[in-house]
Amino acid sequence: MIELDRLDLGGGRRLVITSEPDAAVPQVRDADGHWRRAGPGDGVAEAMLDALNQNPGTTKHGNFTLLSWASQTARGERPITVDQTNESVIVGDAAVVKWATHLQEGPHPAPARIKALRGNGFRGMPMPWGLVTWQTADHPETLVVTVDEYLPDAVDGWTWAVALVTDAAQDRAAVPALVDAVTAVGCVVAELHAAQADTARPATAADARSWREAALETVETAATLGTSVSGELLRARREDVEAVVGTLGDLAGIPVLAGHGDLHVGQVLRAGGRYVVTDFDGNPVLPAEARVKPVPAALDVAGMAQSLAHVAIVACKYTELAPAALADVDRLARTTFVGAYTDRLETLGHRSVYDPAPLRALRLQQVLREIIYAARHLPRWMYVPDAALPALLDEGTST
C-alpha cells in the first residue's frame, strides 16, 4: 500500500488515499504514535461528520474538496455488516459514512448529480449530508467519502420486490400492494428526471453512433462469453438482436439528461414506507468518461423495467409459482411502473425529456450485460439472462 495523500481530521484521525490498492482508508493514531487502519468505534467517521459540520458549503483542503450540507454531527459508530463494495459506518443512528475502499477512475458522476438533485429539491434519495472528493494534476476528480442520512431497516429491491411479486403471483389479494410499490417507484424516477430536466439537451449524431457501437460490442462480448442457454440463443438469433440494438444509432435528437445511469430494483431502498434511489456512481461496466455523459431518460426506465422482469425470474427460482399467474404479475409490474413514471413526469411538466423509442433496445442491451456479468463475475446469476433473453426476444410489447 502506497500513501498518495491525506486529509487531517484532527484528534489523531485522518483519511489516507492509497494506491495498490486504490482506496480511501480511514486511519487512527494509537497511543504509541503509530497509524493504523481505523474501524467502527475508532472515531474517524465521527471526525468526518465534525469536519463537514465545521465546513459548510464547498471548501478546498489541499487536493480534497468537501461539499457539506450537514447542520449537525453525531456520536457512536457501528458497522454495516451486509456485503457491499465499499466500507460503511453508521454514526449515531443518524448518518452513514461510506469510505470508498475501491476508488473509481475519475471523473466521477456522483458529486455533480447529487449536488444538482439536492439543489433542485429531489427528496427521493437518502438525504445527503456531504461528500468528499479528491483530485490532483494526475488524477481526475473522484469520490472518496459519501455521507447520507441513515435509514433504519432499509431493504433493497432484490428483497422487497421479490417478496411482493411472489405474494402477488400466489394470491390476487396481494396484487394491490405490488401495484402501489411500483407506482411509487415510477413516481420517484419521474421526480428524479424532472429534477435534472435543466440538464436536458438533444443527443448528437456522435452520441447515437457511440451508443450503437457500444451495443454491438456488447453483443459481440456476450456472444463470445455466453456458454449457457442465453449464449446459445444469442448466437442463433444474433442478427435479430443486432437489428434491435442497432436502432440506437438512429437516435440523434432524442433528449438526454444527467440521469441515474445504472438504475435497477437493487438501487431502490424501501424504508419507513417510502422508496428512495441510491448509488449515483454510474454503470461500473462503462469507462469513466462514459459514466459522466448524459443519457436518454429511457435508459433509466429500461433498467428498472427489465430488472422487474428479472425479479419475476428470481421469484420463481425460489418459490414454485404458477407460470400464467407469474407472467401476469410480471407484465403488470412493468406496465404499472412505466405508466406511473410517464404520468408523474407529465404532471410535473417535463414529459418532453422522455422518449420511449429506445426502450426495447435498451432492455435488450441490459440483458446482454447480465450475460457478461454472470460469465465474468457471478456464474450462479446466469439463470436470470437464460430466462430473460428468450422472454424479451419473443415479447410483443415495449414494456
From Swiss-Prot:
Q: Per UniProt, what is one GO molecular function of this protein? A: glucosamine kinase activity
Top-rank EC class of the record's enzyme? transferase
According to the UniProt entry, where does the motif Substrate specificity determinant motif sit in this chain? Answer: 366-381
InterPro entries found in the cross-reference section: Actino_Glucosamine_Kinase, GlcN_kinase, Kinase-like_dom_sf
Q: Which residues bind ATP?
A: K98, E149, Y150, L151, D156
Residues bound to D-glucosamine are D262, E370
Keyword list (alphabetical) reads:
ATP-binding, Carbohydrate metabolism, Kinase, Magnesium, Metal-binding, Nucleotide-binding, Transferase
Biological processes, Gene Ontology terms: carbohydrate metabolic process
The chemistry this enzyme catalyses reads:
D-glucosamine + ATP = D-glucosamine 6-phosphate + ADP + H(+)
Q: Which residues bind Mg(2+) 2?
A: D279, D281
Q: How is the cofactor bound?
A: Binds 2 Mg(2+) ions per subunit.
Q: Which residues are involved in binding Mg(2+) 1?
A: Q267, D279
Q: Record keywords: Ribosomal protein included? A: no
Please state the Enzyme Commission number of this protein: 2.7.1.8
Cofactors required: Mg(2+)
Q: Which residues form the signal peptide?
A: none
Q: What does this protein do?
A: Catalyzes the ATP-dependent phosphorylation of D-glucosamine (GlcN) to D-glucosamine 6-phosphate. May be involved in the phosphorylation of acquired extracellular GlcN derived from the hydrolysis of chitosan, i.e., in the incorporation of exogenous GlcN into the bacterial GlcNAc metabolism. Is unable to phosphorylate maltose.
Q: Kindly give the HAMAP family that the UniProt entry links to this protein.
A: GlcN_kinase (MF_02218)
Q: Describe its partners and assembly state.
A: Monomer.
Q: Which NCBIfam families match?
A: GlcN_kinase
Could you say which protein family the record assigns here? Belongs to the actinobacterial glucosamine kinase family.
- What is the protein name for this chain? Glucosamine kinase
